[in-house]
């Protein structure tokens, strides 16, 4: 699978809710109303990621969860990451 160019990633961003290209990955931070709401969201995303065998890096800081997507085996952002970002958008609503 080919790594996307910066231009290709930038072209995909308008269709993604709150995602940005930063530090070589697609990133989205979400603030939840309560800590356990964030944990539940992480669980739902993790179940989907496991089924797809494509796992985001996840950082939990109290009520804020940050998802980062990069295809490590390819060394950059690929179509799999863009699709997973769309999937996460759907899971989080």
From Swiss-Prot:
Keywords: Lyase. It is an enzyme of class 4 (lyase). InterPro entries: PCD_sf, Pterin_deHydtase. GO terms for biological process: tetrahydrobiopterin biosynthetic process. It catalyses: (4aS,6R)-4a-hydroxy-L-erythro-5,6,7,8-tetrahydrobiopterin = (6R)-L-erythro-6,7-dihydrobiopterin + H2O. Its EC number is 4.2.1.96. GO terms for molecular function: 4-alpha-hydroxytetrahydrobiopterin dehydratase activity. Gene3D superfamilies: Transcriptional coactivator/pterin dehydratase. Belongs to the pterin-4-alpha-carbinolamine dehydratase family. This is Putative pterin-4-alpha-carbinolamine dehydratase.
């Amino acid at each position: 699978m080919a790594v996307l160019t910066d231009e290709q990633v930038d072209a995909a961003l308008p269709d993604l809710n709150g995602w940005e290209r930063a530090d070589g990955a697609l990133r989205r931070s979400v603030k939840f109303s309560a800590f356990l709401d964030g944990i539940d969201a992480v669980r739902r995303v993790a179940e989907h990621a496991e089924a797809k065998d494509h796992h985001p890096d996840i950082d939990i800081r109290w009520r804020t969860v940050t998802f980062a997507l990069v295809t490590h085996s390819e060394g950059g952002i690929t179509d799999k990451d863009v699709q997973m970002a769309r999937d996460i958008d759907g899971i989080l609503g």
